[in-house]
């Protein structure tokens, strides 16, 4: 599994993400980026390649992960203004219990958010069912800081 990130530097998140993907794919395979299709639920994939990928972007950064396994990535800026009221809507009971005692509730909510987004991307189902039907931990090792962002990467 390979992960790359960059600042947008005047590009759209889509443009920067595709450039990261093209670079990772070339580094891994020595080939140009193949065509990309999307599933009926919008998950992008390579139809004729054993490689899987995921792209995420924020207002300032893009992230890409490339793997031989189904993979997903989500990133959020650490300084993102997130409404704490969302916790009641998107957290499961076990997650809400962790959130309620967290020293930094904004960071806790962002942690759960990137985990939920990555899980939704990994499943290919989107956020339906994910906001409050998960049981993630604030100590989940799949979340890391990268370029001033919280980033979650999941792989099957």
Predicted regions mapped to residue ranges:
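Core catalytic alpha/beta fold that binds nucleotide/phospho-ligands
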Residues: 1-156
